[in-house]
Amino acid sequence: MALLQIAEPGQSPKPHERRLAVGIDLGTTNSLVAAVRSGVAEPLPDAQGRLILPSAVRYHAERAEVGESARAAAAKDPFNTIISVKRLMGRGLEDVKQLGEQLPYRFRQGESHMPFIETVQGLKSPVEVSADILRELRQRAETTLGGELVGAVITVPAYFDDAQRQATKDAARLAGLNVLRLLNEPTAAAVAYGLDKGAEGLVAIYDLGGGTFDISILRLTRGVFEVLATGGDTALGGDDFDHAIAGWVIEQAGLSADLDPGSQRQLLQIACAAKERLTDEASVRVAYGDWSGELSRATLDELIEPFVARSLKSCRRAVRDSGVDLEEIRSVVMVGGSTRVPRVRTAVGELFGCEPLTDIDPDQVVAIGAAIQADALAGNKRGEELLLLDVIPLSLGLETMGGLMEKVIPRNTTIPVARAQEFTTYKDGQTAMMIHVLQGERELVKDCRSLARFELRGIPPMVAGAAKIRVTFQVDADGLLGVSARELSSGVEASIQVKPSYGLTDGEIARMLKDSFDYAGDDKAARALREQQVEAQRLLEAVQSALDVDGERLLDEEERLAIAAQMDTLRELAGGSDTAAIENQIKRLSQVTDAFAARRMDATVKAALSGRRLNEIEE
C-alpha cells in the first residue's frame, strides 16, 4: 500500500515519473541493494559489476573503507576492520563480551550500556558501522539509478527484538536513508517467490545467513502473505560453521587455541574458503602456516551437525506454533548463503519431505523481495497491492500485583496491531500507577524481560478497584512498540515509545520460548498461588479498613473476635504455598463478614436518606 506523500505547491512529481526506492538486505556477512527496473526486481551492481557487498568496514584515520577491500585487510588490521557487526546491533556490552572469543575487538562501554569499538578513527558504535555499510549501498543505488532515493525497505531477521530493530532504523537515518519499512527477511523471500511463481498454500522460509537463523511458516493466498509463526536463533549461522572448521584445523595441527587477532582472522578466512569449495567438491586441501591437511565433505557434515540440528529444532517448534502439520507444507524456500551447504539442503529436505526451492539465488532473494515491496510503498504500483502480515516473536504485556505478567498481545499476533486492556487500582486513594512493560512467555515478571517503565499520575482518589485505567499497546509495521495509559473518568494520560538501550542476549529469545514450554505447569501453579495471595491481601486490607471505621458501632465483641480469628488464619496461610487452602480461607473470611457488609450498606443507605421526604426520593 502506497505511502501518501505531500509536496509543496508546484513540486509534486509528474504522474508518469517513478519514485526511486530500493530494497536493502543488511546481512551479517554480505549486504545487497536491489530495485525494480523495467518491471523486474534485480540487485544493483557496483562500478566493477559486483552485486554482493561484504559487510565489512575498515577504519583509517580520515576515511572508512567498505566492502571487499576492507574484508581482505581483516587479517592484517583486525582491530580497525569490523565484520559481522549485525551480531552487535541492539546489544549491551555484557552481551557482546559473551562473544569475546569470536570478536577480536577492543570494546568500551558508552551511555546506556551500548558497546563502542576502539578504532584508529575513534570510538565506533555498531549503529555507526552499519550506517557506513548502508551509506555505501545508498551511493551505489543512486549512481546506478541516476537519482535521489525517496526511501528504502530494509530487511531484518524476524527474530530481531525491539532494540535491534530500532538500532537498524537509527543506522539508516545516519546513512541518510528514509526507511519506508523494516521487513522481516522471511517475508521478503516470500514476496519474491510469491510474485515470481504465483504460489499459494503453506510455505516454510528457511533462512540461514552468516550470523542469524530464521524459520517462518507462511500462508500465501492471492497476494496476501500471512506469517503464521516464526522461530529461529539470533546467534546461529555460517560464522559458526567457519569457527567449527577453524577449531578442527587447530586440533589437527596441534596449535594453541589462544591465537592473536590477526592469526584468528586469517584462519577464519581459510575456513570460510574451504567451506565454500566443499559446496561443489568432495574434499579440499586446507593449509595454515606449516600445516596442511585434507578436509572432506563428510567431516564438514560432522562438524556442523550440531548447528544444523539446532536449526531443525527451531523448524519443528515453528510448525507446531503455526497449528499445521509438516505434511501440509507444500514448499520450502531456502534463503541465505549458508543454505548452499549440501548438508543443510539435505537435512531440510528430509525434515519437510520435499526438495527445497533454490530457483532464486539465496543470497539475492531477500533483497529482491524488499525491492518489490519498496516499489509498492513508493507508489509505483498503482494497480497492484501486497498485503504483508508479519507477526511479533514474543508476547508483550505488563506487570500486575503479585509480580504477575499479564499478556496484552500474545506472540505470533499479526502486526501492525493495537490492543487495549483495562486495569484498576489496588489501594484506597491510589493516585498514581507504575506501568511496567514486559516481553516474554512466562507467567511471572522475574522470568520475563523488562522493556520499559513509566508512571501514570493524577488518578482521582477512589476506593480500591473503582478507577478504570485503559492501557493500550501498539506495535507498528516495523515491529516497534508504543504503550499508553489513560484513566477514563479524568482523562489523565501518559505514554512511552519503547526504545530499550540494548537487545536480548544470544539465544535468549529461543531460551524464553523453550522455558515457556518446559515450565508451563510450574508457571501456572505459581501464577495461581500469586493470584490467591494478592486476593488474600486485598481482602484483609478491605476488612481491616471496614473494622477501623464501623467495627465498634456495628459488631458485638463475639463477632469481632470471630472475624479477627479468620483474618489471622488467612494471614498465616497467605505466607505459605497451599493455593487451595488460601482460596478456601478467603471464602470463609468472606462468609463471616457478609452480615457486617450488609449492616454497613444499610447504615450507608439510611444516612443518605435521612431527613428527606418520600416525594423527594421518588423524584
Curated annotation (Swiss-Prot):
Keywords: ATP-binding, Chaperone, Nucleotide-binding, Stress response
Molecular function in Gene Ontology: ATP binding; ATP hydrolysis activity; ATP-dependent protein folding chaperone; unfolded protein binding
Xref: SUPFAM superfamilies: Actin-like ATPase domain, Heat shock protein 70kD (HSP70), C-terminal subdomain, Heat shock protein 70kD (HSP70), peptide-binding domain
Stretch forming the signal peptide: none
Keyword Cell inner membrane applies: no
Pfam family, one: HSP70
GO terms, biological process: iron-sulfur cluster assembly
InterPro entries xrefs: ATPase_NBD (IPR043129), Heat_shock_70_CS (IPR018181), HscA_NBD (IPR042039), HSP70_C_sf (IPR029048), HSP70_peptide-bd_sf (IPR029047), Hsp_70_fam (IPR013126), ISC_FeS_clus_asmbl_HscA (IPR010236)
PANTHER family: HEAT SHOCK PROTEIN 70KDA
Family assignment from sequence similarity: Belongs to the heat shock protein 70 family.
Function: Chaperone involved in the maturation of iron-sulfur cluster-containing proteins. Has a low intrinsic ATPase activity which is markedly stimulated by HscB.
Full protein name: Chaperone protein HscA homolog
Species annotation: Pseudomonas aeruginosa (strain UCBPP-PA14)
Encoding gene per record: hscA
